[in-house]
Amino acid sequence: NAEEGCNAGFLRPDALLVVTMITDTEDVESKTSPTNWYDAVVTAKGDPGAVVMLAIQPQTQVGEPKPNCTYDEGYDLRLRQLIKMFPFYAEGDTCAASYVPFFETAAGRVAEACASFIPG
């Protein structure tokens, strides 16, 4: 977010930050924790209420497995831990037949965040 950097002006005090993550695998490579990620985002943005976290990721398997789907193996995914630290978040399933319900929920979370957002 440096003035001369390629992302100059990306973080603005007059705008929400909407972070969207899409994955079909668990993060096993990161050396830090969801708490570290949360702290970094809040430090950069200044207010957790000015952030909307969205994630489409594997869910716990219910019933017969769907072909070509990845499932949460029963442990709490690190991205799930991260998004739930923020007051505004939505989570979708990588194996969903449609992503429309997820994005409708996501749009609702953004609207909720906008309604309570006071630009800095």
Language model regions located:
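Extracytoplasmic, non-cytosolic globular domains
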Residues: 1-118
